[in-house]
Amino acid sequence: MDNNLTSKLKYREAKLGYLMILPLLTVVLVFIILPVMGTFWISLHRDVTFIPEKPFVGLRNYLRVLSAREFWYSTFVTVSFSFVSVSLETILGLSFALILNERLKGRGVLRAIVLIPWAVPTIISARTWELMYNYSYGLFNWILSILGVSPVNWLGTPISAFFAIVIADVWKTTPFMTLLLLAGLQAIPQDLYEAALIDGASMFERFKSITLPLLKPVLIVALILRTIDALRVFDIIYVLTGGGPGGATTSISLLAFNYYNLGDYGIGSAISILTFVLVLSFTIVYLKVGRFRRD
């Protein structure tokens, strides 16, 4: 009798659980799974605007993309941008979070100021940086002219354009890392620090033995979110350089956009699916590394 009652209660709880997550599953199905499946289906066809027929070509679009130098170069640009940007944002975000976690006068105002760049829409932020990078009347070249230094074409060479984009992205997104890591720091019990202080632990020892281990789960989540976002970078590059000079800063998303603009939806969709696979691969690596270190 008791076993039967327990089984019924478990069934009701399971049924309630499924009903609770049903709206979320519906959203995931409609806005994630179906669009990805639709994009994959298009990528299996020669879908070009000026060609009425859309013949099924299988994986031919993928072979064409994978054999193209521009795809691998854009992949290199995207991965390099993600690595440099996320690394800098993590270091700066953790530094700001540690400072804002201290009991400072006016830290509420400081937190609000730090979050301002994140609140600015990316298009507006990128346009502002574009004006500051301008060769003729930009802020940076104006400062150089005061110092007696020749102006620099910040967006005119591949290397300078790459780092110009990185700087703009770091300024925009570091507050996001700061916010996540600050929330993780505030969840760490202060008793641990007080006990370590009594034991004579230095600031570095407290950071190494208490802060980093307890902050690691939040740090991994922050890295996953930022890496996913960085690998999909489009808007800030589109506004600042448009992929130039000479395609030197073209990301994978921008490359797919260019093919869509040309009306080649089959190739554009294939690049989009490969971008999805790239993002998924990095996410799995982060999760595996994080789980291994926790174990």
UniProtKB/Swiss-Prot annotation:
TM region(s), chain numbering: 16-36, 79-99, 112-132, 146-166, 210-230, 236-256, 267-287
PROSITE patterns (alphabetical): ABC_TM1
GO CC terms, sorted: ATP-binding cassette (ABC) transporter complex
Cell compartments where the protein resides: Cell membrane
InterPro entries: MetI-like, MetI-like_sf
GO BP, sorted A to Z: transmembrane transport
Gene3D superfamilies reported for this sequence: MetI-like
Keywords linked to the UniProt accession: Cell membrane, Membrane, Sugar transport, Transmembrane, Transmembrane helix, Transport
Superkingdom classification of source: Archaea
Keyword Transmembrane: yes
Domain named ABC transmembrane type-1: residues: 75-286
Membrane topology: Multi-pass membrane protein
Pfam family, one: BPD_transp_1
Coiled coil (UniProt feature): none
Subunit record text: The complex is composed of two ATP-binding proteins (MalK), two transmembrane proteins (MalG and MalF) and a solute-binding protein (MalE).
Known role: Part of the ABC transporter complex MalEFGK involved in trehalose/maltose import. Responsible for the translocation of the substrate across the membrane.
Family affiliation: Belongs to the binding-protein-dependent transport system permease family.
Designated name of the protein: Trehalose/maltose transport system permease protein MalF
Gene: malF
